[in-house]
From Swiss-Prot:
Record protein name field: Small ribosomal subunit protein bS1
Natural source organism: Leuconostoc lactis
Lineage: Bacteria, Bacillati, Bacillota, Bacilli, Lactobacillales
Function noted in UniProt: Binds mRNA; thus facilitating recognition of the initiation point. It is needed to translate mRNA with a short Shine-Dalgarno (SD) purine-rich sequence.
Pfam families: S1
Keyword Ribonucleoprotein: yes
Gene behind the chain: rps1
Comp. bias regions, Basic and acidic residues: 382-399
Listed GO MF terms: mRNA binding; structural constituent of ribosome
């Protein structure tokens, strides 16, 4: 390289001398003097080159962009450095030819040097790292502050973000209130995050999106709660499904439809009847502002079997039903599809029943009379006994052996001369 610089210097600085030196001895002497001067200059350049080290900030002029998408930079020392695209920007798809033009000035930090037998010393430079260093030096936020961040990438452990040129990290556990299985949904998005830890000396910046998300959710809840009231029917979108129910988005806030509130029919798994993204009408059952919970019902917005029952059944109706369950206190009888009423143990028979299972079992067909129906409470009281003939009242003698009313009535129907009380009761009188 020194030889190349000599040739360049001779050709550019002393063209007349190079042309005429063969014609004059004086010119040869002049060349000797200038050669010595140039050697001293080259030595100075080489000495300056030796002084460039890793970590130094250098400024150079863009000479070319090579086939590897690297910016070739001419340094003030007369040497060259290269800035790979990956060290120019975080944008993996950047094309330096679209960003730079020949002659542009580039400031970068030296991250390594490479020695080549032919080319001398070349430096690997990074503009991106210099920008980050400057950003750290000019920090305008502190721990606890909320900042705007750009998500650069999603990795297994969390999100890599850029905050005003400073590289930061949001751990997966701090991305949201609940576990996020796919972090890629945040790539290239702008987020707000709270500064949890900041260590400029080690270029360490830890942030939490969850803390800010919780504040945003609280604000959203307050706004949504102010617009809702218990008993109101609103439209929502199924946001996610679980084994115990479906979460419905009511406009930025989710409410829960418990599996028991999805349908009037029995639902084993919410995914059997609902799909994420479904539009559904829901009735608001409860609003818990303290815990930020909203209880919803889909089935409450639909006409169910009890509505049909109210139309078809009235107190006094006699129906045939099927025994579904037998309990100690009575038997549940299905009188319409999905509609069961209770026959209390006292309403099973005119005879004394200790346990309903003595006379009834699941699957039995029985005749019942409706004693009372309350559709709003989904309750029907039934009776089997009411359909039985009432037995004649048995009048028995008292425990002390006295005559029963039946005996006395029979006596009164007899002629006074037919018999005496002694004839009737014998020695019991």
């Amino acid at each position: 390289m020194a030889h190349a610089l000599k040739r360049i210097l001779y050709a550019t600085w002393y063209p007349d001398i190079l042309v005429n030196y063969t014609h004059s001895v004086n010119c040869r002497r002049t060349l000797d003097v200038m050669s010595e001067t140039n050697n001293e200059f080259l030595a100075a350049l080489e000495s300056a080159a030796d002084q460039i080290k890793v970590g130094d900030v250098v400024t150079g002029e863009l000479l070319a962009i090579d086939n590897d998408n690297q910016a070739v930079v001419g340094l003030s020392t007369g040497e060259e450095g290269v800035v790979p695209a990956r060290e120019y920007s975080d944008d993996r798809n950047i094309n330096l030819a679209d960003e730079l033009k020949i002659g542009d000035t580039i400031e970068a930090v030296v991250i390594s040097n490479v020695t080549s037998d032919k080319e001398g010393v070349a430096y690997l430079l990074s503009k991106k790292r210099l920008d980050a260093r400057k950003a750290w030096e000019n920090l305008s936020f502190a721990e606890g502050d909320t900042v705007d961040a750009k998500v650069i990438n999603a990795v297994r452990g969390g999100l890599i973000v850029d905050v005003n040129g400073v590289r930061g990290f949001v751990p997966a556990s701090m991305v949201a209130e609940r576990f996020v299985s796919d972090l890629n949904q945040f790539k290239n998005k702008d987020i707000k995050a709270q500064v949890i830890e900041i260590d400029p000396a080690n270029a360490r910046l830890i942030l939490s999106r969850k803390a800010v998300a919780a504040q945003e959710l609280a604000a959203q809840l307050a706004e949504v709660f102010s617009k809702l009231s218990v008993g109101e029917v609103v439209e929502g979108t199924v946001a996610r499904l679980t084994d115990f129910g479906a979460f419905v988005d009511l406009g930025g806030v989710d409410g829960l439809v418990h599996v028991s509130e999805i349908s009037h029919d029995r639902v084993k798994n919410p995914a059997d009847v609902l799909t994420k993204g479904d539009k559904v009408d829901v009735k608001i059952l409860a609003l818990d502002t303290e815990k930020g919970r909203i209880s919803l019902s889909i089935k409450a917005t639909q006409r169910g079997p009890w509505d049909e029952a109210a139309d078809q059944i009235a107190a006094g109706s006699v129906l045939e039903g099927t025994v579904k369950r037998v309990k100690d206190f009575g038997a549940f009888v299905e009188i319409l599809p999905g509609i069961e009423g209770l026959v209390h143990v006292s309403q099973i028979s005119n005879k004394r029943i200790e346990n309903p299972s003595e006379v009834l079992k699941s699957g039995d067909k029985v005749q019942v009379k409706v004693l009372d129906i309350k559709p709003a409470e989904e309750r029907i009281s039934l009776s089997m006994k009411a359909l039985e003939e009432k037995p004649e009242r048995e009048d028995r003698r008292g425990n002390d052996g006295s005559a029963s009313r039946a005996d006395i009535a029979a006596y009164k129907q007899q002629d006074d001369s037919a018999a005496t009380l002694g004839d009737i009761f014998g020695d019991k009188l």
